[in-house]
Amino acid sequence: KVKTIIDKAPVITEKMLRSEATSNMYDKKGNVIWSQTDIRRNYIKYDKLPDLYVKLLLNTEDDTFFQDRGVSIKGLANAILSRGRRGGSSIEQQLIKNVAFSSDVKDRTIDRKVKEFWLALQLDTNWNKKQILEWYVNKITMGEGSFGANTVAITYYGTSLDKMSERTPENI
């Protein structure tokens, strides 16, 4: 059964992971099935992310990010016990969720969690951690049509993330 589920998982490409002015949702063959362009996004490279921001983000979202292989076993167990309705996903799983799956609660199933798990392993195998984290911070939505950490910093604080003081990132 697991192989059948994995076989139905979408193929993740670098194009899907890279942030663009448009957010797209893709089918398993890599075809765009949904697109949204009325968003704000200002891309920031990994080497421009303040160290404090990275530490705070990982402490909050995935404290084993640089040690794990793309998945959180604890998070997966948590999701299975809650029938796929609870979080605990790794950074890789969250990134996969943002680029490949619907955010609709009714779509959160054990099958989808298995696909996320598999795709997160593939992500971790095919790309390095810094690249994955760069894509992640540029894909996340923080409200008000703002996508990515840099856009959030500009929207809420009036300055880009790499120009913020060390006191400010903890408020993001």
Predicted regions and their residues:
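Juxtamembrane regions of bacterial inner-membrane/periplasmic proteins
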Residues: 1-172
